[in-house]
């Protein structure tokens, strides 16, 4: 007599429920086939259930939200907690701390099959093997409408076992480098007199993933003005532009004084299959800059029953800011599939960001290291951007073209416009012309800056080197790359000038700033303190580099690169903008020379984006962020849709 595979599986399930005729059997099941439910009637979750692979095996979630902001209420404002107390307190309070189930919607299901014939003395036990895994995993049993914690010594009765157990599993933490890899083997043991049976199922905690630009933006973040008219204008413009892009959620404003909102956290998520689609917990990833207090606020202000947060401890510097983290959208290449895309981060002379290994430990968005040693800030967002597209790949790459940027100025000069102002930005309402000083250079004067053309040729070469890496890793072709004109100059040398001295500014003790801005007077060399800048007043907020510096002596020796040759955007870098919708990008206004009524840089940028089927909305960031060595993207953040499968 022959049986089909399906009939054999059904027979096996029936045998599992027969105790005395065929011996005691125990069966525990999870969503091994990842269809969002546990199959207790068929065989779809039986095969290979004891082994976890990237292609098959049950998933569960780190339940690290903060329902009702219980922890935030206990802590109080982040600025009230002295740094001497350390940052470990942030890890010690979330929904998975202790053995109370505060957020059951993030439990992954486990089921045991009913065992009909058991004596009254039969007992059952469910536990996780491996001490490390057991310390990271929680199991609960449903009793009525409540969930009861199943500890190592918890015993199930014969009555419990006869009906089958409805269990749930969650994790206390995420995958960690050189720590727990997220795997858990759950064992189910039943004993009845002299008989004993055991079974197991393999699971793994879902990875923490970062967003890519094919996922539409759902919320925008920035930092409040705190009575600063410049930041206030930036925020007002951002709110207007986010609404114009169709984003319904109001812009979330942090109240921590750190205007570099892109840099102190990376919005992410973790998800598993559910019966009605992915079950998702948003996860805010703090930058690996433990002395950057603003990073605390993703725990204090953003966590709730649908949002969690994680931190990977370390005292990073500017390349550890999360502006130095972007995500290549999903793709397949050379037999490899990246359904959640891949992360890119810039490295300095082989020194990777401290978060790199944490991201690698998630084992889904295998990070790629690019070269940003030529940039003073060192962020990948300074020269590239991914855009959604209706092409076969689903996305394209936009990159800076410094040679084209210089050529725009040279062409204007050749056509007789060399004496025109190189920077067209006017003073806006509320900007005192003395305090908020604007550069007066002409096009020809900019072109005569020391090594201006050769510097931009070097920048172009370094960008091409990074494009080569992306081509090698993704199969990207030249037809999928769009180049926008841009210019760079030495970050710690004379560039734009302004006839204002520190004594004319609001802070008489200030000294000249790093960046392509200079003020008359003796050179002080590279410095990272607050400055008066040639492109504006004393910069009221910390520069993007200052904000990233570790406090105290921990940062000594970190900037081992040759900073005197490092570059920063000369005109506002339009690639360093925010993708808000599938045809809407918010870019910093470049304020290029105006010839025949048009900003020649803005026009060229718009034409390039139009070829990629995108409309550009420009937003001024000259005084709010550009003079501090950043742009619109650096001063904002976004979280995006999370409904796509990564498994």
Provide a role label for each language-model segment:
Residues 1-21:
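Fungal secretory targeting signals
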Residues 20-647:
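Histidine/cysteine-enriched polar flanking segments
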């Amino acid at each position: 007599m022959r049986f089909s595979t399906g009939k054999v599986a059904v027979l096996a399930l029936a045998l599992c429920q027969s105790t005395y005729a065929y011996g005691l059997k125990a069966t525990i099941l999870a969503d091994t086939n990842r269809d969002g439910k546990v199959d207790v009637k068929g065989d779809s979750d039986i095969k290979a259930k004891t082994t976890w692979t990237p292609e098959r095996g049950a998933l569960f979630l780190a339940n690290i939200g903060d329902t009702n902001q219980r922890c935030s209420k206990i802590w109080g404002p982040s600025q009230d907690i002295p740094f001497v107390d350390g940052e470990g307190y942030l890890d010690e309070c979330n929904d998975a701390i202790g053995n109370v189930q505060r957020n059951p919607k993030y439990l992954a299901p486990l089921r045991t099959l009913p065992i009909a014939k058991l004596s009254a003395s039969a007992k059952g036990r469910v536990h996780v093997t491996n001490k490390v895994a057991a310390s990271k995993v929680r199991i609960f049993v449903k009793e009525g409408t409540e969930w009861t914690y199943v500890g190592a010594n918890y015993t199930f009765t014969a009555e419990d076992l006869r009906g089958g157990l409805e269990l749930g599993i969650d994790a206390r933490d995420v995958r960690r480098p050189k720590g727990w890899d997220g795997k858990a083997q759950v064992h189910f043991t039943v004993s009845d007199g002299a008989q004993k049976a055991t079974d197991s199922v393999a699971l793994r905690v879902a990875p923490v993933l970062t967003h890519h630009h094919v996922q539409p933006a759902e919320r925008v973040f920035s930092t409040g003005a705190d009575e600063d008219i410049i930041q206030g204008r930036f925020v007002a413009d951002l709110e207007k532009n986010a609404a114009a892009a169709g984003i319904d959620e109001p812009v979330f404003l942090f109240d921590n004084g750190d205007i570099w909102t892109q840099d102190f956290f990376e919005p992410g998520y973790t998800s598993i299959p559910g019966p009605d689609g992915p079950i998702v917990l948003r996860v805010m990833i703090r930058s690996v800059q433990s002395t950057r207090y603003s990073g605390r606020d993703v725990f204090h202000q953003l966590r709730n029953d649908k949002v969690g947060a994680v931190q990977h401890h370390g005292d990073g510097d500017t390349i550890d800011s999360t502006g130095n983290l972007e995500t290549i959208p999903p793709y397949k290449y050379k037999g490899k599939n990246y359904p959640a895309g891949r992360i890119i981060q810039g490295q300095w002379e082989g020194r990777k960001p401290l978060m790199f290994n944490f991201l690698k430990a998630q084992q889904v968005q295998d990070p790629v290291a690019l070269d940003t040693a030529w940039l003073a800030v060192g962020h990948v967002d300074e020269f590239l951007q991914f855009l959604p597209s209706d092409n076969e790949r689903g996305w394209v790459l936009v990159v800076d073209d410094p040679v084209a940027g210089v050529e725009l100025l040279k062409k204007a000069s050749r056509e007789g416009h060399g004496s025109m102002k190189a920077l067209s930005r006017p003073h806006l309402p509320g900007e005192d012309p003395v305090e908020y000083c604007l550069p007066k250079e002409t096009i020809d004067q900019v072109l005569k800056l020391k090594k201006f053309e050769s510097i931009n040729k070097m920048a172009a070469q370094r960008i091409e080197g990074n494009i080569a890496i992306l081509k090698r890793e993704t199969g990207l072709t030249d037809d999928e790359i769009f180049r926008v004109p841009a210019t760079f100059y030495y970050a710690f040398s004379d560039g734009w000038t302004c006839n204002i001295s520190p004594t004319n500014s609001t802070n008489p003790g200030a000294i000249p700033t790093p960046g392509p801005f200079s003020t008359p007077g003796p050179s002080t060399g590279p410095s990272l303190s607050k400055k008066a800048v040639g492109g504006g007043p004393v910069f009221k907020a910390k520069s993007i580099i200052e904000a990233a510096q570790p406090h105290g002596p921990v940062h000594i020796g970190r900037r081992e690169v040759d900073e005197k040759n490092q570059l920063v955007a000369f005109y506002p870098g339009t690639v360093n903008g925010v993708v808000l919708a599938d045809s809407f990008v918010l870019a910093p206004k470049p304020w290029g020379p105006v010839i025949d009524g048009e900003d020649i840089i803005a026009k060229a940028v718009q034409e390039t984006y139009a070829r990629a089927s995108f409309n550009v909305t420009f937003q001024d960031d000259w005084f709010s962020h550009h003079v501090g060595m950043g742009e619109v993207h650096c001063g904002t953040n976004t979280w995006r849709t999370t409904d796509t499968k990564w498994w």
